[in-house]
Regions:
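Catalytic-loop motifs flanking and including active-site residues across diverse enzymes
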Residues: 47
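Conserved short "hinge" loops at termini or chain/domain junctions
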Residues: 1-44, 58-259
């Protein structure tokens, strides 16, 4: 049995994994059917790497100077456990690096952006697994992202409710995807990019175990208020009311009335 035949089931499982976690079924089918699509080679690489991650432990497989070899004769001996683990780590890194490239390109595909898969990646200020590298995580990026994502969402929710507003936070998520950014004026793009970068910095700061920087966040609120024409989502939100208390009126019928 050839190596391809041995890998065939693993490749099918890899495609299912890609559809469930990255592309969605329709986008995967569309890319697979278009030989000219620039993302197709990336998908193929991810599928092969993901398949090998699960196949290598169950195959008599080693990496030789001429490529992969199947241990089935006296000329090739099985690799040590340490070498196999290094091989798996290398392939996993190749897969994760390719996922980063693929997600960058998918953000330009309207079909994907509007899909359930695209919306999953648009739920935070970090729509890619490379956030792990910004946190100093150098390996197992996919797994690392799955651990970080709930923490990111929790931090962003607190920032949204207390400072930025859920409405503006939602649109900042969408800002990173295609059409919305293109529809903004030059001044708006600059302001939104500034706010996005500063918020990402705060989320990363808190992910590192630090408490919220209250003054830092208050300064961002002041930035929004000073550019309120560019952030109408915030102006119309309940969060904005926290920063615009009602004006005191000295009424005679009130208990605290004074002359």
């Amino acid at each position: 049995m050839s190596l391809y035949e041995k890998l065939n089931n693993y490749l099918s499982e890899a495609e299912t994994w890609i559809a469930a976690n990255i592309t969605g079924t329709e986008t995967l089918a569309a890319i697979s059917a278009d030989n000219e699509d620039m993302t197709r080679p990336l998908l193929c690489r991810i599928a092969v790497c993901h398949a090998l991650l699960f196949a290598i432990p169950s195959l008599d497989l080693v990496l030789t100077p001429n490529g992969f070899g199947i241990v089935n004769n006296q000329n090739i001996v099985p690799a040590s456990k340490e070498r196999v683990e290094r091989l798996i780590a290398t392939i996993e890194k190749q897969r994760d690096d390719t996922i980063i490239l693929l997600l960058e390109k998918l953000r330009k595909k309207a079909q994907w952006v509007d899909s359930d898969a695209g919306r999953y990646w648009a739920e935070t200020l970090f729509p890619n697994i490379d956030v792990c590298e910004r946190m100093g995580i150098k390996e197992h990026l996919w797994d690392g992202y799955q651990r970080l994502r709930p923490q990111i969402i929790a931090i962003e929710t607190l920032i949204a409710n207390g400072f930025i507003s859920p409405e503006l936070m939602h649109d900042l998520h969408d800002y990173q995807f295609g059409d919305m950014c293109n529809s903004l004026s030059a001044d708006a793009k600059s302001a939104w990019a500034y706010l996005l970068t500063r918020l990402q910095s705060e989320v990363l700061y808190q992910l590192g175990g630090q408490p919220p920087r209250q003054q830092y966040l208050a300064d961002l609120v002041n930035f929004i208020r000073n550019n309120i024409g560019l952030f109408q989502q915030w102006a119309e939100s309940d969060t904005a009311k926290l920063y615009t208390p009602p004006v005191f009126v000295n009424k005679k019928e009130a208990q605290g009335y004074f002359f």
